């Protein structure tokens, strides 16, 4: 079964709760639920897979996410909800759609090989989107616009 997410907004749930339910495709990966505090200061985030460093602004909202327990293959925070009550999922495996890749090709990580070459960081991958987007958005519209602003 492919990755599937069900989002229920506060106006659709019986008690006003925001609910997110999600499954992952592929092999079993243990997940955990984390609550990240709000952060006032700017910081940087380094992606595990593509080795890209991204500057993050201050005023990050408090949010939850569900990353893999092991970070060896990337963080993969599959879903989360922020303090503005915006829910997000991002790892719906965009890699399998050739039309998307044709319109927006990957910027692939290139490892340093030898003394005369440099490491070339890759682009932002689906495994980093929740971390880079969710703490900074107040609506679904902002969630669509933020990745393009990165």
Sequence positions of predicted segments:
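Short, charged, surface-exposed loops that flank catalytic or proteolytic processing sites
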Residues: 136-142
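A contiguous strand-loop segment
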Residues: 1-126, 146-150
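Intrinsically disordered, low-complexity acidic segments that are enriched in bulky aromatics
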Residues: 128-129, 138
């Amino acid at each position: 079964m492919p990755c599937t997410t069900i989002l229920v907004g506060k106006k659709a749930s019986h008690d006003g709760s925001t609910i997110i339910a999600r499954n992952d495709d592929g092999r079993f990966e243990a997940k955990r639920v984390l609550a990240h505090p709000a952060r006032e200061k700017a910081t940087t985030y380094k992606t595990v897979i593509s080795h890209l460093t991204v500057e993050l602004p201050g005023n990050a909202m408090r949010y939850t996410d569900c990353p893999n327990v092991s970070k060896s293959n990337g963080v993969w925070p599959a879903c989360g909800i922020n303090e503005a009550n915006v829910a997000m999922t991002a790892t719906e495996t965009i890699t399998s759609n050739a039309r998307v890749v044709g319109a927006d090709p990957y910027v692939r990580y290139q490892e340093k090989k030898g003394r005369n070459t440099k490491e070339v960081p890759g682009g932002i991958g689906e495994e980093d989107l929740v971390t880079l987007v969710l703490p900074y958005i107040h609506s679904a519209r902002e969630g669509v616009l933020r990745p393009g602003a990165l």
